[in-house]
């Protein structure tokens, strides 16, 4: 990440921001070569859906076969922590300020949206990846795909 995000955010807020960022980021294949968000969000969604049942299966399998409970609990906790790691990464990414080149691209897309008559909230500080996700989502739904030519 380019610069350090604000460290005053609690873990729970970071996970909530990660979930919001995952829902906001446009899952467009044109963005995949440049941004890792598509891959991380897809893996996190998969983990949220698959890992809790896998943890329960691991626990019941170990208990049913008379195995040791310690390793079974450790494996289940590890399986449940994987989606949390993805949400944590997405949350940290969402509050990270954009590097200068991406900030310039962000302002160009925002300017194109404003020129097309879209109402946007004013920027109160340096743009973050969350504000980029908001603008990209709006641009994909309102503009033609030529705004991606500068990427």
Swiss-Prot record:
UniProt key word Cell membrane: yes
Keywords linked to the UniProt accession: Cell inner membrane, Cell membrane, Membrane, Transmembrane, Transmembrane helix
TM spans (from-to): 46-66, 69-89
Protein name according to UniProt: UPF0208 membrane protein PC1_2779
Family label: Belongs to the UPF0208 family.
A GO cellular-component term linked to this record: plasma membrane
Coiled coil start-end: none
Places the protein is found: Cell inner membrane
Signal sequence, start to end: none
Main location: membrane
InterPro entries with a match to the protein in the record: UPF0208
Membrane topology, record value: Multi-pass membrane protein
Keyword Nucleus tagged: no
């Amino acid at each position: 990440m380019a610069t350090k995000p604000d460290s005053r955010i609690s873990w729970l807020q970071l996970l909530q921001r990660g979930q919001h960022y995952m829902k906001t980021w446009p899952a467009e294949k044109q963005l995949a070569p440049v941004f890792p968000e598509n891959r991380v969000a897809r893996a996190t969604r998969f983990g949220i859906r698959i890992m809790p049942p896998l943890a329960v299966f691991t626990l019941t399998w170990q208990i049913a076969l008379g195995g040791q409970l310690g390793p079974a609990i450790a494996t289940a906790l590890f399986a449940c922590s994987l989606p949390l790691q993805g949400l944590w990464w997405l949350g940290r990414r969402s509050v990270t300020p954009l590097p200068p080149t991406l900030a310039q691209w962000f302002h160009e897309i925002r300017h194109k949206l404003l020129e097309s008559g879209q109402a946007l909230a004013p920027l109160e500080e340096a743009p973050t990846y969350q504000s980029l996700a908001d603008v990209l989502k709006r641009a994909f739904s309102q503009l033609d795909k030529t705004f991606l030519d500068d990427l």
